[in-house]
């Protein structure tokens, strides 16, 4: 964690100087989060209909610095990601004990170029993920952890590289890979690959229907993630998504990383 923070500073601080080509930016995020990918910053909630659990996402990704090139269609940015995804248990009287929480932070670099037949973009992230059980996973009356699962160390530092192509503004396909350069437990695979796509269609000027899917080869079980719904607002800007979701494969939560998780449900995200 300390190494990741220091590397972040070493990359950012030299750019704050008035070097030619670099400047701070307050423009919208250049590489939009992958809709079906779990490991993206979001603000929202998903209800698991089959087991009455909830997933709460809190986080954001911001571009901080941009590089100006002579090519009018090419853009390069550097930014940061900070978010958590939390597993909650649904109980009566609107009680939602926190079972497990995973947090991710790091930084990213993205590049986009407008070609004659579409937009080619790429994003490289260097991130840290850590996972923890919380008091909702503990049985206070017996003094034991629930389901016989005690807390265990789960931590990883990794590179995540995505290449995407959008032939039109409402269609995007992508491929990517993870390289885990430090991981605990060490039995986890160091390489993972994924591929996916997104499609949206305007219904009115402020309402868009969409669908998205991602397949991830994790080295444990393949993970399938599907999402379909509508968005109120600008498709590439601020708005609110309401959607149906399907998940099949290993759990996204580090404390449950070797346990199969299959659910369907409904959710919403607020795109900032």
Where are these regions (language model features)?
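Residue-level detector of the transmembrane beta-barrel scaffold of outer-membrane proteins
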Residues: 40-42, 77-79, 121-123, 172-176, ...
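Solvent-exposed loop/turn segments connecting transmembrane beta-strands
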Residues: 48-55, 117, 181-191, 203, ...
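Transmembrane beta-strands of outer-membrane beta-barrel pores
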Residues: 45-49, 64, 82-88, 113, ...
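Outer-membrane pore/translocation modules
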Residues: 19, 72-197, 248, 257-260
């Amino acid at each position: 964690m300390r190494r990741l923070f220091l590397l972040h500073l070493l990359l950012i601080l030299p750019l704050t100087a008035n070097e030619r080509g670099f400047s701070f930016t307050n423009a919208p995020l250049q590489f939009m989060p992958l809709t079906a990918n779990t490991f993206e910053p979001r603000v929202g909630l998903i209800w698991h209909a089959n087991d009455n659990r909830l997933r709460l996402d809190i986080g954001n990704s911001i571009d901080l610095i941009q590089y100006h090139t002579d090519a009018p269609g090419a853009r390069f940015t550097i930014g940061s990601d900070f978010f958590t995804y939390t597993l909650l248990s649904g109980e009566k009287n609107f009680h939602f004990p926190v079972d497990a929480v995973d947090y991710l932070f790091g930084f990213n670099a993205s590049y986009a170029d407008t070609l004659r037949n579409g937009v080619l973009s790429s994003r490289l992230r260097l991130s840290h993920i850590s996972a923890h059980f919380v008091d909702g996973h503990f049985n206070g009356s017996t003094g034991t952890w629930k389901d016989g699962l005690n807390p265990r160390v789960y931590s990883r530092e990794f590179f995540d590289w995505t290449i995407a192509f959008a032939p039109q503004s409402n269609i995007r396909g992508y491929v990517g890979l993870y390289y885990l350069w430090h991981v605990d437990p060490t039995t986890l695979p160091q390489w993972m690959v994924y591929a996916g796509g997104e499609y949206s269609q305007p219904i009115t000027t402020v309402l868009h229907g969409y669908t998205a899917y991602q397949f991830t080869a994790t080295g444990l079980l393949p993970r399938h993630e599907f999402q379909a719904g509508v968005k109120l607002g600008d498709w590439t800007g601020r708005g609110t998504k309401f959607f149906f979701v399907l998940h099949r494969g290993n759990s996204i939560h580090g404390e449950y990383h070797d346990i199969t998780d299959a659910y369907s449900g409904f959710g919403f995200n607020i795109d900032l």
